Amino acid sequence: MPELPEAERARRQLERVVGREIVAVDDADTYVCRPHAPGEMAAALVGHRLSDTHRRGKFLWAETDGGPGLGLHLGMAGSLTVDEEPAPRNWDRFVLEFDGGGRLALRDKRRLGRAVLDPDFSHVGPDAAEVGREEFRARVGRGTAPLKARLLDQTVISGVGNLLADEILWRARLGPRRVPNQLDTAELDRLRRSTRAAMRDAIRLGGAHTGHLIPHRVRGGRCPRCRTALERATIGGRTTFWCPACQL
């Protein structure tokens, strides 16, 4: 599932088409382009150019030169492709075509991505890679749900998925079942530093799957730091691995 690093890679793809005039739009997939009717996005975007790109957590959007904003979400398995041949089996769910040739496509085999005009991100928490110290303390250090579930809540901070949550907690030496409102300030600050470091490393190395813990998230896996057998459970509805010796 795409997490913040994959979304940042997609934003950089989107950046490649800034300044190119849109001459055609394929918005026929009524599920991916909901709530827009077929042709509505095309009518709003044709003749405009993307002028800037942004990301908050897993959510992407682009400004246009006088037209509406364009919001994109990769869903569970989507990606953005630029100037590639059309995908087989109609997996290109939303497509922009540009003057002089070339195309941007939301490619999504599972059809869980989104394309929408003028997206509303008021329900989305601050970007996990950029949230400040005081705001992180106030948002994450609340509530009694397991700490991992708190990190996964996109209204609290945005961009942390299942793999990154395990990696962040392992780096911070905090157990996934810890109660957020019982963490002290030093623990919350350590968690924020671990979050930012894990995000930076994952963006640099190419995705959430590159974390130190991730290759060991298997049955029988051992902690790469102390070699203790990892524990495995479902926490917050997600499969979770952690070190019972390091993560307290």
Task: Please identify what each model-predicted range represents.
Residues 1-248:
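Structured catalytic/nucleic-acid-binding cores of DNA maintenance enzymes
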